[in-house]
Amino acid sequence: MASTSDFKNGLVLQIEGQLWTIIEFQHVKPGKGPAFVRTKLKNVLSGKVVDKTFNAGVKVETATVDRRDMTYLYHDGSDYIFMDGDTYDQVSISESTVGDQSRFLLENMAVQVATHEDVPLFVELPVTVELVVKHTDPGLQGDRSTGGTKPATLETGAEINVPLFINTGDKLKVDSRDGNYLGRVNS
């Protein structure tokens, strides 16, 4: 059990028999009335996102989630194959469980897999990943119609917006949570 004061991003709650992870939360103390906590929850299995409000101090059932270090090996049809670093067992995780994170997965990348009762819930990549630009058009000096950015295709196939000075073959640092360009990596 966790109180609303224990809420943090990534905490997995068990509500009405389903697992929900906290994406965002905000403690609110209005001028009148009792304090409450406004949350945005994501259903772990279906991916559905809902807004839910809890009264301050309410106890909520939490789920026991184990985080295991694994290495991404390869993509096989609609499954992604990971290897447990401790037991060397290979684990197959569905595309729907990996979700949008697959855009930045590279072979032999170290990740964390969250499981509940040995069922994979979600995959957490490192916050920043280093990827090589496979293709981007040359940036023209003075071209500001796109706000100083242009599209670039990375080695994983993901497409992100990068500054005009980025060229094909450059190694970039990218935020794996939202796909934002963070900087160029010096080789």
From Swiss-Prot:
Keyword Protein biosynthesis: yes
Pfam families for the chain: EFP (PF01132), EFP_N (PF08207), Elong-fact-P_C (PF09285)
InterPro entries per record: Elong-fact-P_C (IPR015365), NA-bd_OB-fold (IPR012340), Rib_uL2_dom2 (IPR014722), Transl_elong_fac_P/YeiP (IPR020599), Transl_elong_KOW-like (IPR013185), Transl_elong_P/YeiP_cen (IPR001059), Transl_elong_P/YeiP_CS (IPR013852), Transl_elongation_fac_P (IPR011768)
SMART domains for the chain: EFP, Elong-fact-P_C
Major localization listed first in the record, in broad terms: cytoplasm
Cross-referenced SUPFAM superfamilies: Nucleic acid-binding proteins (SSF50249), Translation proteins SH3-like domain (SSF50104)
Keywords: Cytoplasm, Elongation factor, Protein biosynthesis
Pathway of action: Protein biosynthesis; polypeptide chain elongation
Intracellular or extracellular location(s): Cytoplasm
Record GO biological process: peptide biosynthetic process
Gene3D superfamilies registered for this protein in UniProt: 2.30.30.30, Nucleic acid-binding proteins
Domain of life of the source: Bacteria
GO cellular component terms attached to this protein's record: cytoplasm
Single Gene Ontology MF annotation: translation elongation factor activity
Family statement: Belongs to the elongation factor P family.
Role description: Involved in peptide bond synthesis. Stimulates efficient translation and peptide-bond synthesis on native or reconstituted 70S ribosomes in vitro. Probably functions indirectly by altering the affinity of the ribosome for aminoacyl-tRNA, thus increasing their reactivity as acceptors for peptidyl transferase.
Name used for this protein in its record: Elongation factor P
Organism: Rhodococcus erythropolis (strain PR4 / NBRC 100887)
